[in-house]
Amino acid sequence: RRTFAYKLRNKAMNMFSSFENFNLIREKAEASRKAENRPHEVLYFHKVDDPYSHLTVHYIDKFKEAYDVQFKPILVGEENPAALHEPTLYTDYCLEDVKRIASYYDVDFPGKSYPEKKLVDKANSILTAVNPDEFGSVAKTVSHALWSGDLAKLEELEVSCLLYTSPSPRDEL
């Protein structure tokens, strides 16, 4: 049935999703950022046991060199399996896909299978302690050790990160 509420809902949804409205919101946000003299921010969501994160982390430093941005890494955990249509197929595909494409990005991907939970937890604990400015370089090393199954290297990194990383802005709070 086509009712007045139907027409009103369609009008509201069209206004909400319009490209012009999107641009207005973007322009207001950009004007606000400039008025507050804030740099552009890039939020990078990193999942240590995600094969695509292994590829992406190799380009963080290049990205930061190319653009004047404030880089904010955020570690994420497991996704809700209910959100994935076929969770097993998805994880299998991700792993196989990265094995196939890593060489095209000049990235060494040593993973043959997903890392053990113990290694994933160790990698997360290391990256949690890292200053955002050092995240790219440390995360590359951590990721390679994780996907290689190298517990000794992760333990070595954990000790060195805790001893030698500069204080995080979170520590100043």
Region spans (language model):
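N-terminal leader/targeting and pre-domain segments
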Residues: 1-28
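Exposed alpha-helical structural elements
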Residues: 3-7, 11, 97, 137, ...
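Glycine-/acidic-rich phosphate or pyrophosphate-binding loops and their flanking alpha/beta elements
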Residues: 29-34
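Local sequence-structure signature of Cys/Sec-based thiol-disulfide redox active-site neighborhoods
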Residues: 36-55
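Structural alpha/beta surface segment adjacent to cysteine/selenocysteine redox centers
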Residues: 48, 54-146
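Acyltransferase
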Residues: 147-152
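An amphipathic alpha-helical core segment
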Residues: 156-163
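Single conserved hydrophobic/aromatic residue that forms the stacking wall/gate
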Residues: 164-173
